[in-house]
Amino acid sequence: MGETEGKKDEADYKRLQTFPLVRHSDMPEEMRVETMELCVTACEKFSNNNESAAKMIKETMDKKFGSSWHVVIGEGFGFEITHEVKNLLYLYFGGTLAVCVWKCS
Amino acid sequence: CLLFLFFFQSLNMGRGTRKRDEDSGTEVGEGTDEWSQSKTTVRPPDQLELTDAELKEEFTRILTANNPHAPQNIVRYSFKEGTYKLIGFVNQLAVHFSQVGNLIPKDSDEGRRQNYRDEMAAGSQESVKVVLSDTENLEEDEEPKEAEAEAEAEAEAETGSQIDVPTVEAVETVPEEELMTPRQPKERKLTNKFNFSERASQTFNNLLRDRDCQMEPPPRTNFSATANQWEIYDAYMEELEKQEKTKEKEKAKTPVAKKSGKMAMRKLTSMESQSDDITKVTQAAKIVERMVNQNTYDDVAQDFKYYEDAADEYRDQEGTLLPLWKFQNDKAKHLAVTALCWNPKYKDLFAVGHGSYDFMKQSRGMLLLYSMKNPSFPEYTFSSDSGIMCLDMHMDHPYLVVVGHYDGNVAIYNLKKPQTQPSFRSTAKSGKHTDPVWQVKWEKYDDMDHNLNFFSVSSDGRIVSWTLVKSELVHTDVIKLKVEGSTTEVPEGLQLHTVGCGTAFDFHKEINYMFLVGTEEGKIYKCSKSYSSQFLDTYDAHNMAVDAVTWNPYHAKVFMSCSSDWTVKIWDHTIKTPMFIYDLNSAVGDVAWSPYSSTVFAAVTTDGKAHVFDLAVNKYEAICNQPVVAKKKNKITHVQFNPIYPIIIIGDDRGHVTCLKLSPNLRKMPKEKKGQEVQKGPAVEIAKLDKLLNLVREVKT
């Protein structure tokens, strides 16, 4: 009984947590929204390949906002980065992924 | 090396060669492709002219391998035989042309050697050196390298050179060849010597120059975080909770929500309690304000309660006015006091109407209610677009204040309601006055349906009765003032009237239907509510506009009027001439009977003086005549007695209201006689005034 509930909970959780959850960002509103959408698109497109997703995000960001973007996608990692101000977005996505996008040239 | 040998032998060399040169092309054409090409003969100008026979003559040429110039008769001494012998074998070889080629077969030894050299050169030497090197250098280079080459290859090359006849000649061309080969690109593509040419030119290099500047790097900050599954999970759960909460809030906001009704109710009550808190604070603030005022105006309050002018005893028949509080408000600055009215229930509360008497300077109006307990700030404040000209408070409903505006409107303010707009207001549709409303008064008695009603008088000549029916004002024209004798007949039989401009009116205290109207023309009409076209009586009272008309509170027959013609007149309404006339040397703004004595009244004049009369004491002049406003410029506009305390309030045209205490002489009661109880009550007061009037009547009759 408890197990099924647990599964159900998990399913619920997965179902509910599809939205991106911005943990930290100092980007301007417009840029933040765009980046967020890009992250969602990339993570959905390469749902089983974080590397590709990160590559896609990085390359798109380079094109859109100038070079030297860095992207980290993973389920568990710690980081300490130096970034240009107004160019950082750290968000959770899909309940299990953390995406950190920043610019530093 | 390639060698070409040609032997030509002809029988007739001179003509033969020429002929061959000439016809070589055409002969071939004639023989094979006659059909394809038309014959064109190109003749040189110096061609021999030959006859046909000559041309047809055949010459036979035989190409043989024998050298025609070779000697046929070479005789050499034979040592073997000891004699000269003819040598039969003659070398037929003759060299006409010799050319050393620079193409080397790849497979040949020399070709291989050359390749090897190139590789070595590319590997060890810099290209620049190769380019710059001389032919001699190259020759020198070549030889050691050749020496280095394997012994076998060298041996082979030497044996191979036996075949080449002109080896010695070839040496001359070697430098050329050697010059060319190192220049070849590394892919060992041997250049075609026949059409390969090389060109080069040198240009100036542009000068290089350094230029730099330093700029601030884009600002950076550090950011660090750790992402792991439990943190992500927690973050999402938190977010979800938040979302649910906001949803709940939205539900709570909609009144339809049933399930969350209790929650909503709780929230609502908390909201209410919040707003309650504010009112609690205001209550507390009010109390503190009162306390502060009580402290500040303690001496004034003491004076109000206990001070009696001791000098009055010695002055005999004269009294003074002691100024107490002064009421003023910044918002009502420069707005004249146009109306004063004590509240019938709360004796310390009075209403002040602000507006302007200046026709040219009309602006906004204000209704302020002050309490003597708080002289610093009004209890209630109402603003209006048009100036207030008059006001009245209802006897039984002391929270209802009716005001008349300069623009002809009447409005009712309800002090119980917190709104700043009047509860009722007349409109152009509902019969508002077309001229300033000069006086409004509540009717003491409600009409048959117990609806509240009041009267108003205006310069447009109408006296209107207003009834409060539910939520609107219903108006009835009671009377239209017509100037007597001004009726003019026009041909159609219509009558035109000049309207009288009402400025003041007062209801009779006992006779319900009767009232008096003062006009701008100076006349006073006695009217009845039942007759709208007729006056009961007309008094030629004044020469200028009547400012106030008021019945005596005790004596039913007596009324008083004042006017800008400097006079105050006291009348018996049954007699057309005034009983007493007092000239005050300035336009009289207002008069008021005292509430405690039938013979005491106060009048204020525009020169800033207040006059208090007691007819019982002095029939001829005022017993108090005192300037009460600071500046002479200030005109006093209105005066009112407090219903119970011995004080009056005086308003001036600067918006100030001054409260003054009447000294004992001004409210002297009949002296107590020994053993006799002093009679009190209306009867005594009536008798007192009657006694006076009788004196006058006797004189008159």
UniProtKB/Swiss-Prot annotation, chain A:
Cited Gene3D superfamilies: Protein Inhibitor Of Neuronal Nitric Oxide Synthase
GO CC list: cilium; cytoplasm; dynein complex; microtubule; plasma membrane
Pfam families: Dynein_light (PF01221)
Location in the cell: Cytoplasm, Cytoskeleton, Cilium axoneme
Biological-process GO terms, alphabetical: microtubule-based movement
GO terms, molecular function: identical protein binding; microtubule motor activity
Cross-referenced InterPro entries: DLC_sf, Dynein_light_chain_typ-1/2
Keyword vocabulary terms for this entry: Cell projection, Cilium, Cytoplasm, Cytoskeleton, Dynein, Microtubule, Motor protein
Magnesium among keywords: no
Associated disorder: Mirror movements 3: A disorder characterized by contralateral involuntary movements that mirror voluntary ones. While mirror movements are occasionally found in young children, persistence beyond the age of 10 is abnormal. Mirror movements occur more commonly in the upper extremities.
Similarity field: Belongs to the dynein light chain family.
Biological role stated in the UniProt entry: Force generating protein of respiratory cilia. Produces force towards the minus ends of microtubules. Dynein has ATPase activity.
Assembly mode: Consists of at least two heavy chains and a number of intermediate and light chains.
Record protein name field: Dynein axonemal light chain 4
Organism phylogeny: Eukaryota, Metazoa, Chordata, Craniata, Vertebrata
Name of the gene: DNAL4
